[in-house]
Each structure stands twice: as C-alpha cells, then as structure tokens.
C-alpha cells in the first residue's frame, strides 16, 4: 500500500466563548473533536453529517484557513498545522478548495481569465500569452468556452461559476482538492454535470478529493470511502459500498433511512431517531449521540466510544455495535483505518437519484 497523501491525526478545534469581565471558566464550542483519517492519491473521501456537525470547520482546518487547537495535518509527510505563514505558502500549491457558494467565492471585479490565473501569479511571473493559454486550457478542461475568459462572474450562471471555481482550483496543479458542499447550491441537472466533471478530472490527473456533502445520493456515486460526522467527531469511517449496504453505527443507519427512496418497491429502513443535535457548547457526557440513540446503554452515557476497526475494514465508534475491548489505538494507526487497497473511481453520474 502506498504512503498516504494526507494524514490527519487527532485534529481538534475549540472556539472559546468570551463571557464576563474576567473571562474565567470560559466555555468553548467543540467544533471538531479528535478527528483522524487518511486520504490516498486518486481517492475520494466523502464527509457527511447534519448541519453543524463540523464538516466545514474540518475543511478549513485542513486548508489551514484557521489554526487547530491541537492535532496534526500531514501533507506528504509534512505537518502543515505547525508551519509558520511564510513556510505554509509553498504548501498552498498542493491543496486547493472549491467553496460552497459559487456567487460569493469569486471576485466580481475580475474576469474569468484573471480569476483563473491569479493563484498562479502569486508564485510565478507569467507573460500575457501564458496567462491567456492557461485560462483557455483550464476553461476547456472544465467544459467552458474559451470566450468566457473575458466575462465577469455576474454574467455567468451558477453552474458556470462553480466550473470557474474548479478551474481556479486546478490552476496550481494541486494534489488534493477539498470541495465543501460544492454542488448543494445548484439545481439537479447542473449538480450531475459538476460531479461528472470532478470524477473525469480525477481520472485524468490522479488528484485526491475530500468531498463534503449532506446528500447521500451524491456521496454514494462519487465516494470511495465515507466519514460520518456527528457533533464534531467521526462516528463511522467505511468503504462506500459497505456503508450503504450495511451501516453499523446507529446514526449512520438513521441518516441512510432518512434519505428519500424513489423506487416505491424498495423497502425503506425504519430507524427511530428523535430530538435535535445537542449544542457543541454543552455536549452530552459519554457518547454525544446517546440522547437520540435507541440502542443506548449506561456505558454510552459515561464513556466516549473510541473509533475501533471492524473485521470488514471499516471503523466505528459505538459501545454497542463495536465494543472496544482492544487496547488503545494510536492516532497514527487510527488515521489509517479503512484505507482501500486500490482506488477505483465510480461510474459517470447521469442524474441524481
């Protein structure tokens, strides 16, 4: 098995809430808590969960747009979480991000060509001809006409803007692209086009993708592995096919059961799930899911379940479904759980299910 492109170990992010004159005993928002995983070159890891579970915060931590409270983010063996700003600059080329909102993530004062070439010009001096060739090549690569290079974002549709965002991310030839809800603001037909584009680009260039989404139908098509987050923690990390065929964690079961099934002849899994996601400021003791879990036992209320490996290659944090009788697992070993032996991208998406 090849070395991982990205390795995340015990990544944590707390936001202190300032209160009172002396700011003593300041409560914190536990946005991301002890997250570990690995991503290989050419792999797509999907991160799913309800709103507020920490998905977008995780994406910003991986990009070092915000600093972690603790933990490590290793890109090709280098911990970028500990780098100074001047040292981090060189690593920006290896990781790029496609943001959720295609309307506010593009500079309205720049043309499409300028938006694409701006990241490269931060590192290299380009002639006018080189800028034109780069913009034309990347616009074609994302399925847009070269004539669009002279247009402004306000003259484009949402799908065209998202394609432009992808072209900008590809300009620096990164090894990893993080897509944070990159298709959620688009209509269904445009979603399929963007997803097909990402998968085609991955097959052509071998880039790794971290795809953040709440749409399980999209995840089932584009992902190789899936990390399910709940209240800042990963509760299940699994190969895609195993996760959708037989989810193990009760929360994963509930998510899949809640997804609409267009086939009336297909039986739906009924999983009772009551209540709302607890506050990350005052999370429940033990397993954060226990107030909503139909399987909760006394141990769930007292101890935080570790993410432990299962015989089928997945990892689950559940005292009932995956009792942790084994010794403590190091963050480094935990990050490598459920790694696929080979990466085989999924097929072309014709339409959303």
Curated annotation (Swiss-Prot):
* GO molecular function list: ATP binding; ATP hydrolysis activity
Q: How does it sit in the membrane?
A: Peripheral membrane protein
Q: Respond yes or no to whether keyword Signal is given for this record.
A: no
Q: Which GO terms describe its biological process?
A: amino acid transport; peptide transport; transmembrane transport
- All copies of the ABC transporter domain together span 6-256
> Which species is listed as the source?
Sinorhizobium fredii (strain NBRC 101917 / NGR234)
CDD domains (alphabetical): ABC_NikE_OppD_transporters
Where is it mostly found?
membrane
Identify this protein by name: Probable peptide ABC transporter ATP-binding protein y4tS
